[in-house]
C-alpha cells in the first residue's frame, strides 16, 4: 500500500468515526407560530410542504404574551431556517422583537412568512409587519372553470414558474391589497373574470425579507395515477413550496441534477426504422441538445445492422438502449389471469439473457431499466424486476395495474414512487400528445427528471419533431442534463445539507453513483426504503460494505472526499445464469406478431391513412378487435356462401351433363 493510499484510508476512517458519533437528528427546522395548538388548514399546508422537503417542524403557540419567550427562543435556534406565523397569532407578537430574532451574524437573515391571511385579519397589523406595503385583504369570487393563478416573471423565488399559469381549484380566493409605492412584490396572483389579486407577496422590512400569503379553502383533489394531477396538487401548496424551497436552500431535499430523456419505444437497429432516420435524429440531438434512449425489444437481439451498431457505439452521449419487455407480444406483462406471474418471470429472465447476447454481439451496453409494453405490470412483477437487479421501470403511469395510487402529496409531486415493492417506478410523458408547459415548469421547479416517450410515427413530419419540446426544457433549465435512463436511475436520489456539515441522502434506485460535488470532505447518511423480502448485499465500489436495518429502511454511512464519488450497489441474490437460458425464437405466434409489427411500422405507417389506423387501433383496441372480428366473420361467411354457391352450380352442371350424356346414349340406342 502506498503512503497516499494509507493517508486516504486514514482520512476516510476518521470521517467514519465522526459520522458514527453524530447519530442524532440534524435536519433544519421550520418554526410555525400559531395562536392555538389546533390543526388549522394553514398548519396542515406547512407540515405537508415541510415534510416534502425533509425539514423538521417546530410548532409553538403564541396565545398570550407569556409565550413570547418560548417563541423567540425557537426563532433564534441555529437549526431554524424558516419561520411561518399564522395571521391569527400576529396580535400577540411584537414585530421588532421577532424581526430581530430572525437576524443571523454573517449570513442571510431567516426568511419569514405570514400565512393564512383573510379579510378578517387586522389591516393595521398587515401594514405594520409589511412597512406599509400591504393595506388589507379582500375576497374574490371565482366562477367555476374561469380562475387561475399567475406567476410573476421577475423574481427568483418562483423560477422557473414565472410567466405560467396554475389551476385555481377553489370557488373563492382572497387577495392582498398592495400599496404600489412601498415596494411590495407580488409573486403569485389569483385571476378570475378579468380581476387579478396578489395571493403571495414579498416585502422587505429593514433589510428583512417578509412574505405574506392569503388563506385558501381545502379542495378535494381526486387520487388517481394520472401524472397531470400534479398541477392541481402543486397549485394548492404553491406559496408554501416556493417559500420553503427559497428559505431552506441546500437544507431541503433536492435532486443531484436536472435530468431529461427522450425514449422511442419498439425500435431495433435497422435504418430506417419506420420514420426514424438515426443519422438524421443524431444531427437534431446535437443541434438541440437532447438524448434518445431506444426501448429495445429483446426478441430483436441478433437483428442489428452493422452500420447502425457503429453509429450508436460512436455516440453514447446521444444514444442509449433500455429494455422493452421481452417478446412484446401485446401486453405480455398484463393481468395474471391471462399472463401468469410465472410466465412473466420467465420473460424477465429470457429478456435479460437476450440483452446480454445483444451486448456481446454489438459491444453496445444496455440499461437495466424496464419499459413495459403497452402498460405497466401488476405490482408483484416489480418485485421480480428488483429480484433480478433492475434499476427502475419507466412508463406512462407509475402505478402498477390493479393497484391504487398512494394518497400522499409525495406521490403526486415526485416522478418516482417506491410505494410498490420498494422498487422505483417512474412516470413519463407522451410527447405525441400536448404537454402543458406549466407541467414541465413544475417538474423543473421540483427537480424531477423530465421523461418523454414517442413511437416511430411521431417523426412522420421529420426528424426535428421533438426539437420544440427539447428547446422548451433547455430554456426553462439551461443546465439540464439529457442522459440515458440508466444514468438517470443511478442519480435518482435526493440530498440535503445537515446542520453538522454532512449530508442526508434518500435513494430510490438500488444502484447509485454518489458524487461529493462540495468544497469539503463529508459523510453521506444514506437511506433507502426496503422491504427486505429478498436476501441482499451492499457493495461500495465493488467491495462489501456494512449497513443497518431500521424497520423498512436500509441505512448506511459513507465518507466521500471532496470532488470524488462512490458507487453504492444493493445486489439482490438470485439464481440467474444468463448464459444457460435459451434465447432462440421458437414461438410461431410471437414470430408472426413481431413480423407483422415490423410491417406495420415500416410499411403501413408510411401513409397518412396507415398512421391514422395505427393510432385509432392503439386508442380503441377492444372496439377495433370486435370490428375486425366481425369483418373476419362476415368475410368467412361470405366465402362460405360463395363456396356453397359455386359448389351448387358445379353440382347442377354435373347433373345437366349427366342428363345430356344419358339422353345422347338413349338416342344412339333408338337409332
Which positions does each model-derived feature cover?
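Aromatic-Pro/Gly-enriched surface loop or interdomain linker
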Residues: 24-80, 285, 294
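A glycine-centered loop/beta-turn motif at secondary-structure junctions
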Residues: 29-30, 44-45, 49-52, 80, ...
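Short alpha-beta junction capping motif
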Residues: 32-35, 75-133, 137, 207, ...
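C-terminal domain-boundary segment and adjacent tail
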Residues: 59, 241-256, 280-300, 390-410, ...
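Metal-dependent polysaccharide deacetylase catalytic core of the NodB/CE4 family, i.e.
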Residues: 108, 113-130, 135-141, 289-385, ...
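An acidic, glycine-rich "communication" segment
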Residues: 114-193, 506-508, 518-520
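Active-site beta->alpha N-cap acidic-glycine motif
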Residues: 228-318, 366-367, 374
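Catalytic grooves of carbohydrate-active enzymes
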Residues: 247-276, 361-371, 375-379, 388, ...
Amino acid at each position: 500500500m502506498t503512503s497516499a493510499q494509507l493517508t486516504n484510508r486514514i482520512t476516510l476512517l476518521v470521517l467514519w468515526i465522526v459520522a458514527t458519533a453524530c447519530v442524532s437528528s440534524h435536519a433544519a427546522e421550520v418554526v410555525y407560530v400559531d395562536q392555538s395548538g389546533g390543526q388549522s388548514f394553514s398548519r396542515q399546508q406547512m407540515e405537508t410542504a415541510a415534510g416534502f422537503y425533509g425539514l423538521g417542524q417546530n410548532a409553538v403557540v403564541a396565545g398570550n404574551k407569556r409565550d413570547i419567550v418560548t417563541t423567540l427562543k425557537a426563532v433564534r435556534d441555529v437549526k431554524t431556517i424558516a419561520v411561518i406565523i399564522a395571521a391569527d397569532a400576529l396580535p400577540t407578537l411584537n414585530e421588532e422583537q421577532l424581526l430581530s430574532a430572525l437576524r443571523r451574524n454573517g449570513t442571510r437573515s431567516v426568511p419569514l412568512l405570514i400565512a393564512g391571511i383573510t379579510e378578517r385579519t387586522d389591516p393595521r397589523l398587515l401594514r405594520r409587519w409589511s412597512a406599509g406595503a400591504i393595506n388589507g385583504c379582500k375576497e374574490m369570487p371565482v366562477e367555476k372553470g374561469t380562475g387561475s393563478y399567475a406567476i410573476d416573471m421577475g423574481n427568483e423565488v418562483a423560477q422557473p414558474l414565472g410567466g405560467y399559469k396554475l389551476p385555481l381549484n377553489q370557488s373563492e380566493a382572497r387577495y392582498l391589497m398592495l400599496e404600489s409605492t412601498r415596494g411590495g412584490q407580488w409573486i403569485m396572483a389569483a385571476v378570475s373574470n378579468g380581476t387579478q389579486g396578489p395571493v403571495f407577496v414579498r416585502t422587505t422590512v429593514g433589510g428583512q425579507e417578509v412574505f405574506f400569503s392569503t388563506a385558501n379553502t381545502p379542495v378535494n383533489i381526486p387520487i388517481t395515477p394520472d401524472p397531470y394531477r400534479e398541477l392541481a396538487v402543486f397549485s394548492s401548496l404553491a406559496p408554501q413550496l416556493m417559500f420553503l424551497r427559497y428559505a431552506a436552500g441546500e437544507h431541503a431535499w433536492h435532486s443531484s441534477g436536472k435530468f431529461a430523456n427522450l425514449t422511442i419505444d419498439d425500435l431495433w437497429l435497422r435504418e430506417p426504422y419506420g420514420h426514424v432516420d438515426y443519422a438524421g435524429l443524431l444531427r437534431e440531438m446535437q443541434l438541440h441538445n437532447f438524448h434518445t434512449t431506444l426501448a429495445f425489444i429483446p426478441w430483436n437481439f441478433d437483428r442489428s445492422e452493422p452500420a447502425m451498431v457503429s453509429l450508436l457505439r460512436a455516440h453514447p452521449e446521444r444514444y442509449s438502449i433500455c429494455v422493452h419487455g421481452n417478446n412484446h407480444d401485446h401486453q405480455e406483462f398484463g393481468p395474471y389471469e391471462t399472463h401468469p406471474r410465472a410466465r412473466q418471470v420467465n420473460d424477465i429472465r429470457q429478456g435479460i439473457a437476450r440483452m446480454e447476447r445483444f451486448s456481446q454481439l454489438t459491444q453496445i451496453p444496455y440499461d437495466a431499466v424496464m419499459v413495459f409494453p403497452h402498460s405497466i405490470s401488476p405490482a408483484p412483477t416489480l418485485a421480480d424486476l428488483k429480484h433480478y437487479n433492475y434499476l427502475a421501470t419507466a412508463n406512462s403511469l407509475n402505478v402498477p395495474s390493479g393497484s391504487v395510487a398512494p394518497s400522499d402529496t409525495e406521490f403526486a409531486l415526485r416522478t418516482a414512487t417506491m410505494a410498490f415493492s420498494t422498487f422505483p417506478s417512474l412516470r413519463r410523458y407522451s410527447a405525441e400528445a400536448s404537454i402543458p408547459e406549466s407541467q414541465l415548469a413544475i417538474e423543473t421547479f421540483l427537480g424531477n427528471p423530465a421523461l418523454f416517450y414517442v413511437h416511430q410515427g411521431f417523426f412522420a413530419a421529420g426528424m426535428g419533431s421533438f426539437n420544440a419540446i427539447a428547446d422548451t426544457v433547455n430554456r426553462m433549465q439551461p443546465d439540464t442534463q439529457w442522459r440515458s435512463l440508466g444514468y438517470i436511475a443511478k442519480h435518482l436520489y435526493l440530498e440535503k445539507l445537515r446542520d453538522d456539515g454532512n449530508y442526508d441522502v434518500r435513494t430510490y434506485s438500488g444502484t447509485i453513483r454518489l458524487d461529493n460535488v462540495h468544497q469539503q470532505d463529508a459523510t453521506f447518511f444514506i437511506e433507502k426504503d426496503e422491504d427486505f423480502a429478498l436476501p441482499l448485499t451492499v457493495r461500495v465500489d465493488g467491495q462489501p460494505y456494512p449497513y443497518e436495518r431500521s424497520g423498512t429502511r436500509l441505512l448506511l454511512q459513507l465518507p466521500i472526499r471532496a470532488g470524488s464519488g462512490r458507487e453504492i450497489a444493493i445486489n439482490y441474490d438470485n439464481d440467474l445464469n444468463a448464459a444457460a437460458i435459451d434465447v432462440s425464437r421458437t414461438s410461431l405466434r410471437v414470430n408472426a406478431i413481431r413480423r407483422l409489427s415490423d410491417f406495420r411500422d415500416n410499411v403501413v405507417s408510411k401513409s397518412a391513412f396507415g398512421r391514422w389506423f395505427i393510432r385509432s387501433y392503439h386508442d380503441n383496441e377492444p372496439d377495433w378487435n370486435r370490428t375486425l372480428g366481425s369483418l373476419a366473420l362476415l368475410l368467412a361467411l361470405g366465402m362460405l356462401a360463395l363456396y356453397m354457391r359455386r359448389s351448387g352450380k358445379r353440382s347442377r352442371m354435373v347433373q345437366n351433363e349427366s342428363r345430356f350424356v344419358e339422353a345422347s346414349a338413349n338416342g344412339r340406342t333408338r337409332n
